[in-house]
Amino acid sequence: MASLSGLYSSSPSLKPAKNHSFKALPAQSRDSFSFPHTSKPTNLPLTLSSARSVARDISHADSKKELLKDPDALWKRYLDWFYQQKELGLYLDISRVGFTDEFVAEMEPRFQAAFKAMEDLEKGSIANPDEGRMVGHYWLRNSKLAPKPTLKTLIENTLDSICAFSDDIISGKIKPPSSPEGRFTQILSVGIGGSALGPQFVAEALAPDNPPLKIRFIDNTDPAGIDHQIAQLGPELASTLVVVISKSGGTPETRNGLLEVQKAFREAGLNFAKQGVAITQENSLLDNTARIEGWLARFPMYDWVGGRTSIMSAVGLLPAALQGINVREMLTGAALMDEATRTTSIKNNPAALLAMCWYWASNGVGSKDMVVLPYKDSLLLFSRYLQQLVMESLGKEFDLDGNTVNQGLTVYGNKGSTDQHAYIQQLRDGVHNFFATFIEVLRDRPPGHDWELEPGVTCGDYLFGMLQGTRSALYANGRESISVTIQEVTPTSVGAIIALYERAVGLYASIVNINAYHQPGVEAGKKAAAEVLALQKRVLSVLNEATCKDPVEPLTLEEIADRCHAPEEIEMIYKIIAHMSANDRVLIAEGNCGSPRSIKVYLGECNVDDLYA
């Protein structure tokens, strides 16, 4: 795999009470805590659920009263906690989060431990103990950090090969074999999860209005969605570069998307291999397939980079570079932010400030949601990107000591000012179960392109007013918020905010003592899905045997379940039958799917070969 050596081939604990009668425990003792003196014993152990309940009662009983209202005091707090990264032009405002100085002091030991853990992670320690892996996405934007010279060389050579390949595609040096345009005009990216969300966010944020190649995504196993993307390409399928992204090559959704696209190529009389690119781990199923079939190029994925942090690897960089986005600037922005977030001073570390505010606002147990509101159309997908980064990293059943903690932080959002006409009504006046994060972009348009709709007011001024007005209206009703401000949306600033949140997630995971870098729940879902498909094959076998009888023997759900030796799966069997019936793959002899008790089904035809398989 030439490209893997750098060449592309052209063949929890709880928040302390505001009255300080309740003190947070260290991370190793989160399953109990002590009450102040009452008529009952002082050291009363509670279950985690009880602890969560008490923490919410103590922390938020007078939350509105505790938030500063005096303008002078608020301005002083704003200045005291205002953070600026001058080189990146990034500001962080946490003045509308009501943490206390005592809380910051109590969190200091945890953060110092988190900073040390992050330092060890960057040096190559096993930061993902459940899978025995290093975690190296920070090395991707500063290869000098890589713990081995071979990794440093691999990172640098891969970046060079991505840029060279992209230049050759854009310039037309590498051409599709059958395109009348004589060059590639479209990208079809096939991947799911981090292999899709990262490239989608970057494309939406940074692609020029008229990119050298336009990009489309197949990010699901929905047949109608796949058909739509292929149909939209139309005759341009002949000039489409298909980028297939899968670490193993065995991810069902990505494999299905690939097979569907290959079918479309065959039906159009096109040679898929001459237009296919694989981004995968060396010697994976996908890598071997691409090598044997002679795909256009192959680029590496690494076992030390997870999907949700892969945006600075070939996963995110290749699609971006093909759209004419300056990926080296994106890496520079990320590297600058990485440097800013290595300081061990909480007050001077923007990622630590975010993690601290998340902990305060959600009691360290995810008791409140994080609503992400980017006031810029091009950043619309940032909330979806953060949804995976935060929730897949922090949503864990067990901590690093094996205790059941059910940690997490729910993330959702929309763009401003669309949110003004959607759910801000509930955020301000409804249930108080969230804190907000505003993403502000100062520059509205490129220099020289702005104009006034009315004297002294531009279109962008209205957007600015909506953001600031919403922030003020929420705070006036006791709703806490964080504001992240960048000068403009550029590859550098996008790289910076990605790196900011990656580091914040890692630090937060450390202070609540969980592994941010594995996803056992996702794997459990994949296993359960595989079991459903295995059951479906048994159902089809039973139905085929009954259909091949003379006369045909329609079966009830109970009979199917019995012959599958799975009476406990009768509900799932019904769902399988209903789905297959809707797609004309089983026929109903009696009843209908709306009446499960009476239904009898059989197949449309007997497959004799399957009887003897």
From Swiss-Prot:
It is found in: Plastid, Chloroplast stroma. Inhibited by glycerol-3-P (G3P). GO terms for molecular function: carbohydrate derivative binding; glucose-6-phosphate isomerase activity. The keyword Transit peptide applies. Residues 1-21 are annotated as: Disordered. Residues 1-14 have a biased composition (Low complexity). Keywords: Chloroplast, Gluconeogenesis, Glycolysis, Isomerase, Phosphoprotein, Plastid, Transit peptide. One of its GO terms (biological process) is gluconeogenesis. It comes from the Eukaryota. One of its GO terms (cellular component) is plastid. InterPro entries: G6P_Isomerase, Phosphoglucose_isomerase_CS, SIS_dom_sf, SIS_PGI_1, SIS_PGI_2. Pfam families: PGI. Signal peptide: none annotated. Residues 1-48 form a transit peptide. The keyword Ligase does not apply. PROSITE patterns: P_GLUCOSE_ISOMERASE_2, P_GLUCOSE_ISOMERASE_3. Promotes the synthesis of starch in leaves. Belongs to the GPI family. NCBIfam families: PRK14096.1. This is Glucose-6-phosphate isomerase 1, chloroplastic.
